[in-house]
């Protein structure tokens, strides 16, 4: 991936998939381990790309601390840290803007249940990956996901991601 903070996640996953397709040692597939948002991106690759040439198949995915159902809040600030609190308020207000959804990686998996209709309408990554919109019926994603031999999620004792139950 070219950026963990900035960029359009869908382009980054496409870029990574093309790199994987060019690694001949992976022709028989591979197992993958993802940490934090990297786990979501591995799942996106496994769901979106066919398990046929030129794309190598993912056999097993293990993710640690990955926000597969998104995050619904930003990390908190100390009560006395007014700059942090102002930045947090501004970020939360703009997370569903077109610019944020196309340029800020974390905004692309922000899933606020209090603004769920807005999330479904503007999400450029997570709502698609999770097949959440009412008219989403992407059989390819489902079939590719079912083709995994194993999908293991590990997530506990997290103090940054809200909610920590974001499996």
Where are these regions (language model features)?
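Glycine-rich "HGGG/HGxG" loop immediately N-terminal to the catalytic nucleophile
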Residues: 1-7, 72
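Soluble non-cytosolic domains of exported or imported proteins
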Residues: 7-10, 120
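Serine-dependent carboxylesterase/thioesterase catalytic core
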Residues: 10-116
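Eukaryotic basic, amphipathic alpha-helical target segments in cytosolic regions
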Residues: 24, 49-50, 133, 137, ...
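Active-site nucleophile elbow and catalytic-triad environment of alpha/beta-hydrolase enzymes
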Residues: 115-142
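C-terminal catalytic-base region of ester-bond hydrolases, centering on the histidine
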Residues: 140-167
């Amino acid at each position: 991936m070219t950026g963990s903070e900035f960029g359009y996640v869908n382009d980054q996953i496409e870029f990574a998939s093309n790199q994987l397709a060019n690694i001949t040692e992976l022709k028989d597939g591979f197992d993958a381990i993802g940490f934090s948002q990297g786990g979501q991106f591995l799942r996106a690759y496994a769901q979106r790309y066919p398990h046929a040439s030129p794309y190598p198949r993912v056999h097993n995915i293990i993710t640690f601390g990955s926000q597969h159902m998104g995050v619904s809040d930003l990390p908190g600030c100390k009560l006395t840290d007014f700059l942090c609190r102002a930045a947090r308020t501004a970020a939360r207000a703009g997370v569903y803007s077109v610019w944020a959804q196309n340029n800020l990686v974390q905004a692309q998996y922000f899933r606020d249940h209090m603004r769920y209709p807005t999330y479904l309408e503007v999400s450029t990554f997570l709502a698609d990956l999770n097949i959440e919109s009412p008219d989403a019926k992407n059989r390819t994603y489902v079939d590719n996901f079912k083709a995994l031999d194993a999908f293991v999620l590990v997530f506990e004792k997290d103090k940054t991601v809200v909610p920590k139950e974001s499996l």
